[in-house]
Curated annotation (Swiss-Prot):
One of its GO terms (biological process) is phospholipid biosynthetic process. This is Glycerol-3-phosphate acyltransferase. GO terms for molecular function: acyl-phosphate glycerol-3-phosphate acyltransferase activity. The chain crosses the membrane at residues 11-31, 70-90, 96-116, 127-147, 153-173, 193-213. Pfam families: G3P_acyltransf. The gene is plsY. One of its GO terms (cellular component) is plasma membrane. It catalyses: an acyl phosphate + sn-glycerol 3-phosphate = a 1-acyl-sn-glycero-3-phosphate + phosphate.
Amino acid sequence: MEGVLNFLTNINVIFTLLGYLIGGIPFGYALMKIFYGMDITKIGSGGIGATNVLRALQSKGVSNAKQMALLVLILDLFKGMFAVFLSKLFGLDYSLQWMVAIASILGHCYSPFLNFNGGKGVSTIMGSVVLLIPIESLIGLTVWFFVGKVLKISSLASILGVGTATVLIFFVPYMHIPDSVNILKEVDTQTPMVLIFIFTLIKHAGNIFNLLAGKEKKVL
């Protein structure tokens, strides 16, 4: 019993669980329910992120669909950022900060508040890593926005955005940047971000097949 109590009161465990719970807050689901009486998990792809929210609202002719989708995107991004910010605020070491980031991503994708359903996690991914690898993340966010704006293919923008940040972690750390934002100085490996990118590819497997077949839908 004492071992269980020690485990549950361990600050690393507490913050990992907290990161998971924060990431699990289903903003897209909540806003759609509150303002439109719609269950976003039963519409379109069933995802709770900005893309499905946008498609669902535009299909109903809602005039402020883009604004609501943008709000969902921002909230999903900031919940990942907030989880990591708390871990930094309380002085957790970098390896635990990365663990909290990953936990927040898993929380979004497998929300405990939605029977472990959720979204694909890209907004939360970019938010959670921006305080850990800001240079790579901001460039990745730029690519994500640019591809999404020009090609209007959300899945491709997401994959390229996270992919860009992942590729950059093999170059940026060797430049003259502060140790506090250098992944090799933080955890001595690029593995956490590589795993996040692999997870992104897995979550977008269906989209990748559609892209290769030329059948992937554009954002309306």
